[in-house]
Amino acid sequence: MKVIFLKDVKGKGKKGEVKNVADGYAQNFLFKQGLAIEATPANLKALEAQKNKQKKEAEEELARAKQLKEKIDTLTVTLFAKAGEGGRLFGSITSKQIAEALQQQHDIKIDKRKIELDDAIRALGYTNVPIKLHPEVTATLKVHVQEQK
């Protein structure tokens, strides 16, 4: 019997796959557990429509990420921090502070976990900070750290 998997089933199939399984296994386990549905022409059509919708949403998300990247690449965020001699900061600038400053100064909300800061910024001046907006899109934000007077 052909079935469409609604969830991943270990050793049998992944979500969205159409596979042939034993009739008893399908009726007594997969259908009752809500793990699969019968692969009727109507269900196959619905599956195809769902896949197309997901693909379209993914493309739109990628387009939005590219658009945001172009905007972020032109921006500079200015932060103020107390510094000692030689431009060394007392403390450091973290990804959380960068995300908050981006929100306040440019009204762009970015999750701090998307800011790929290897180490916190510990010196005055300009630093280029990569921001992963999408698995395929990474923007670069210029962060300017100035001494707080």
From Swiss-Prot:
Pfam family, one: Ribosomal_L9_N
Function: Binds to the 23S rRNA.
Family membership noted in the UniProt record: Belongs to the bacterial ribosomal protein bL9 family.
Record-linked PANTHER family: 50S RIBOSOMAL PROTEIN L9 (PTHR21368)
Lineage: Bacteria, Bacillati, Bacillota, Bacilli, Bacillales
HAMAP family associated with the record: Ribosomal_bL9 (MF_00503)
Membrane spanning residue stretches: none
InterPro entries per UniProt: Ribosomal_bL9, Ribosomal_bL9/RNase_H1_N, Ribosomal_bL9_bac/chp, Ribosomal_bL9_C, Ribosomal_bL9_C_sf, Ribosomal_bL9_N, Ribosomal_bL9_N_sf
BP terms from Gene Ontology: translation
Gene that encodes it: rplI
Keyword Translocase: no
Keywords: Ribonucleoprotein, Ribosomal protein, RNA-binding, rRNA-binding
Molecular function, one GO term: structural constituent of ribosome
Keyword Mitochondrion: no
Designated name of the protein: Large ribosomal subunit protein bL9
Domain of life: Bacteria
GO cellular component: ribonucleoprotein complex; ribosome
